């Protein structure tokens, strides 16, 4: 018997030892699923499974990092470094870079995060002179994302008469045209958004059987965490890869499926045994996290679910306090009720405000809670997913790196062509974009011609545009000659960003300079902190100087949960129920538990 199982309970131990057939591990909340997953992988390696043949897919990069660290503690001889581990997006980004040519992309393609995608959509909507109240970039992006998660491409969407009819009925008849133009521009910009990474992975495996066979043979053992929150695109990737060897292990809990609004399909976990008839089911039913009263309350609610995997979740912890149900007639009354109770709890627990959380279904519900907490002098913070990388100065500097790596990235070019100010106005930028559209080339290709008579429309701005293109070309030549952090400082300096803040001293400028310095420090440490890129088998990649492309991938593939930084401030935490997944607090208030709000009535994006 392996020492990896010494601290496991019987159910956990069984799930670890039986790894050579399809497995469904039903892991209730607080049941130690991470310990089981890491112990299972360590045991597989101990039994002779080559770590390079193991693919472990997680929900967040943070989860992947924590799992890898635990496995390295269990298998300290260095073999764990060869496991392919990360989110679906990070793993298949890595594969798509190798296969980009087959799909019509260059290997240095850019990844558009949500902000980049919404910026591009905003440009398209404005160019089409559409009402931004009817065509909000965020809503349009959400619907595009939902379509892609179900493997519906822009072309397929436009050809679907029911989709088009629904859009007309909902007074957004231009949606399919926006979708088509968005897809066209992403391709022209040599860019993929998050959802494209899954779409193109499926296209690769569908259209290129040799590629599918190659990765089937590489990934003989597949493990998927949080399987209840996978969408159709992710489901199909797993099905395709696991078809030959069938050594697939999925871990999840149908009772914790909370991302259907993002395209997650609870059917994926419910039909696993139909997909893999030889599958063995392991149930982790002991909750180590919660008191028995909380477990009982959760069980009584879950029992009402129409479709579920039968299980009996229990706790051997103390009974604990009973769940209290409090009534209020208005949201203001509810907010002050919570604020008063939170203030009392904070005083009684010695001022540990960060052990108190207020959960709600929608972000809009936080306003009343914030007002009440402020009036009661209770310190709080909003856990929103907004991050260091959302700050203007950071987005500006990152856009320079994006353009240097991928000159076809029009969105990056638009952001920095006059940042800091270099006398290139909005009219000139619009002319560049118009010429690019007319010639079916990127904006960068237009700029490269401004030094001659090729672009007469831009003759008056030719000198300024040539200076800008010269700067980018020069920096591009230097990126392979310097260590990453030194190159970062070079870009921040020669771009004029650092100088622009130093020339206008203010608290805001000082803060911006501190943030830029922090970003440069993160680049310096990146070699030791490669938390996204898995190690290539035996090629020494881990010891090589990291590239700008690798660093950009690291920050581009962060999920909202990964971006939410550690906050040492001692404050009550306000967050949506979705953000709270996997977190622990001593005291939790759930507000707005009322009809059509929690649970939310079905809405259409």
Model-based region annotation:
Residues 168, 352, 366-378, 391, ...:
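Conserved helicase C-terminal RecA-like lobe
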Residues 9, 57, 85, 110-114, ...:
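Conserved phosphate/pyrophosphate-binding and hydrolysis machinery centered on Walker-type P-loop NTPases
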Residues 19, 80-82, 101-196, 219, ...:
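ATP-hydrolysis module of ASCE/P-loop NTPase motor domains
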Residues 1-112, 118, 189, 212-213, ...:
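P-loop NTPase Walker
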């Amino acid at each position: 018997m392996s020492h990896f199982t010494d601290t496991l309970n019987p159910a956990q131990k069984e799930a670890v030892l039986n790894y050579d057939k399809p497995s469904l591990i039903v892991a209730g909340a607080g049941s130690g699923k991470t310990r089981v997953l890491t112990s299972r992988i360590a045991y597989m390696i101990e039994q002779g499974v080559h770590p390079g043949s193991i693919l472990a897919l997680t929900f967040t990069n943070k989860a992947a990092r924590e799992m890898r660290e635990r496995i390295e503690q269990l298998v300290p001889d260095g073999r764990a470094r060869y496991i392919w581990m990360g989110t679906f997006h990070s793993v298949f980004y890595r594969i798509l870079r190798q296969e980009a040519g087959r799909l019509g992309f260059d290997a240095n393609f850019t990844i558009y995060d949500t902000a980049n995608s919404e910026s591009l959509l905003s440009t398209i909507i404005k160019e089409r002179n559409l009402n931004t109240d009817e065509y909000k970039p965020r809503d349009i992006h959400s619907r595009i994302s939902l379509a892609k998660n179900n493997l519906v491409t822009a072309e397929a969407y436009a050809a679907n008469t029911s989709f088009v009819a629904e859009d007309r009925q909902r007074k957004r008849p231009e949606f399919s045209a926006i979708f088509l133009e968005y897809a066209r521009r992403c391709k022209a910009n040599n860019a993929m958004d998050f959802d494209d990474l899954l779409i193109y992975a499926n296209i690769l495996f569908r259209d290129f059987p040799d590629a599918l066979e190659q990765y089937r043979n590489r990934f003989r053992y597949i493990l998927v965490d949080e399987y209840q929150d996978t969408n159709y695109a992710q489901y199909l990737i797993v099905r395709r890869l696991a078809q030959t060897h069938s050594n697939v292990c999925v871990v999840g809990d149908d009772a914790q499926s909370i991302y259907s609004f993002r395209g997650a399909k609870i059917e994926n976990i419910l039909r696993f045994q139909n997909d893999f008839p030889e599958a063995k089911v392991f149930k982790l039913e002991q909750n180590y996290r919660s008191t028995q009263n909380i477990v009982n309350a959760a069980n009584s609610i879950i029992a009402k679910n129409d479709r579920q995997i039968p299980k009996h979740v229990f706790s051997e912890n103390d009974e604990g306090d009973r769940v209290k149900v409090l009534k209020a007639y208005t949201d203001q009354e509810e907010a002050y009720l919570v604020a008063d109770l939170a203030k009392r709890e904070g005083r009684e627990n010695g001022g540990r405000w960060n052990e108190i959380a207020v959960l709600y279904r929608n972000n809009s519900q936080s306003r009343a809670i914030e007002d009440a907490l402020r009036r009661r002098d209770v310190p709080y913070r909003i856990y929103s997913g907004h991050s260091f990388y959302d700050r203007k100065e950071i987005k500006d500097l990152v856009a320079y790196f994006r353009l240097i790596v991928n000159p076809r990235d029009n969105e990056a070019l638009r952001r920095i062509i006059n940042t800091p100010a270099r006398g290139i106005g909005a009219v000139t930028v619009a002319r560049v974009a118009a010429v690019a559209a007319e010639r079916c080339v990127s904006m960068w290709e237009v700029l490269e011609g401004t030094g001659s008579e090729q672009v007469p429309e831009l003759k008056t701005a030719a000198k300024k545009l040539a200076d800008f293109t010269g700067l980018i070309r020069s920096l591009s030549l230097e990126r392979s000659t310097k260590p990453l952090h030194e190159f970062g400082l070079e870009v921040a300096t020669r771009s004029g960003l650092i100088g622009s803040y130093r020339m206008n001293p203010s608290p805001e400028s000082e803060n911006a300079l501190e943030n830029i310095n922090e970003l440069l420090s993160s680049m310096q440490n990146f070699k030791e902190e490669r938390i996204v890129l898995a190690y290539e088998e035996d090629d020494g990649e881990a010891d090589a100087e990291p590239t700008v492309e690798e660093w950009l991938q690291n920050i581009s593939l962060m999920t909202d949960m990964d971006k939410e930084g550690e906050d040492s401030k001692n404050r009550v935490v306000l967050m949506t129920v979705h953000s709270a997944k996997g977190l622990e607090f001593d005291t939790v208030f759930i507000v707005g538990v009322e009809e059509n709000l929690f649970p939310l009535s079905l809405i259409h994006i």
